Amino acid sequence: MSSVASGWGAYLKGLLASFGLQLPKAISGPFNPSQGTYIDLLPVLVLVLVTALLLMDSKQVLRLNSLLVVLKFSALAVFILVGLFHLNPDNWANFAPFGFGQIYGGKTGIMAGGSLMFFGFLGFESISMTVDEIKEPQKNVPRGIVLALIIVASLYAVVSLVLTGVVHYTKLNVDDAVAYALRYIGVSWAANYVSVVAIMTLITVCISMAYALSRMVYSLARDGFLPQTFQKVSKTHKVPHYATLLTGILSAISSGIFSLANMASLVNISTLAYLVLLAIALIILRKDKGLPQKDEFKVPFVPVLPILSIIVCLSFMSQYSWQTWSAFGIAVLIGSAIYAFYGYKHSKY
């Protein structure tokens, strides 16, 4: 959620810059005194707004969220249609300039890039965090995740092709790449439209993630892994307000002091780690419980598919720097300490 908020801030700063407006340097970047930046204020403000909205009435906010998704698709359509008329096939002359890369420990190539681009596939698991509010979750949750993955992967492929066809990849090391590409080819109206839509719709991503994370904290508290305070719900809107406040405050602090690249790397490696554990759990579950019931989702090709997933995830994890591994280790230690000193004693399982 923090990293998405940082991306939102980047698009807003890009839009403001196109009109000649800039924030003071001290409040326009992550904490780095040597560069004169101390806090990235915009992501903090948007997360405060998102948290406040969810505390008031999460169901109404989620309805607004669904409407804004339509705007998001319209911005992608504008970019694709405009970009098709400005493609330069020479930009695709060397489709893999750094090759495949190394299976383990690489810094360049497809593997290293894939380990970072994995960030674009985060969030789908949040659907499973709302099972208490979904009809027939055994059927609809897996179907929703698979369908969303198919749609989004297809869009990613098309947008990436157009993006690299319009602007050479060496010039795309920016946080607002789509809007930058449109400005690069001189289509300012489309760039501004994409920026405005991104500013509006990235808020919806923050809302979805904040909603899912607060429900995860609520579920952990309900099961005894976190203090019972976090399972309390407000009397008026039936919102887990303490859980929502916790996720909002921690995310706002992170978005204000850490860079987008660092947050993305930490989120990626953490997600890859739990996907490894998920694949292992699936193998064990299939062995102990047998095949799913008739109306339940059945993962195909077990154990081949989970084993392949483990290998791929570990390969991606090996691409990260020791700094990312250190941050991941600290996060694991904090989580383990919470479980050891509280969750183990109070768990209902």
List where the protein language model places each region:
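Helix-loop-helix junctions that connect adjacent transmembrane segments
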Residues: G20-L41, L67-V196, T324-A327
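Loop-to-transmembrane helix boundary motifs in multi-pass membrane proteins
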Residues: I39-V44, K135-Y156, S188-A191, Y218-G256, ...
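Hydrophobic alpha-helical segments of multi-pass membrane transport proteins
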Residues: G14, A75-F79, M216-V217, V267-D295, ...
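Hydrophobic transmembrane alpha-helices that form the core helical bundles
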Residues: M1-L47, A52-L55, I199-S219, S259-A273
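Alpha-helical transmembrane segments of multipass membrane proteins
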Residues: T51-A52, I80, S160-V162, I199, ...
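C-terminal membrane-solvent junction of multi-pass transporters and transport-like membrane proteins
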Residues: Q35-I39, T229-H241, L275-W325, K345-Y349
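Membrane-interface loop-to-helix entry segments
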Residues: G9, Y38-P89, I145, A264-L277, ...
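Select transmembrane alpha-helical segments in multipass membrane proteins
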Residues: L42-V46, I103-M117, V158, R183-I207, ...
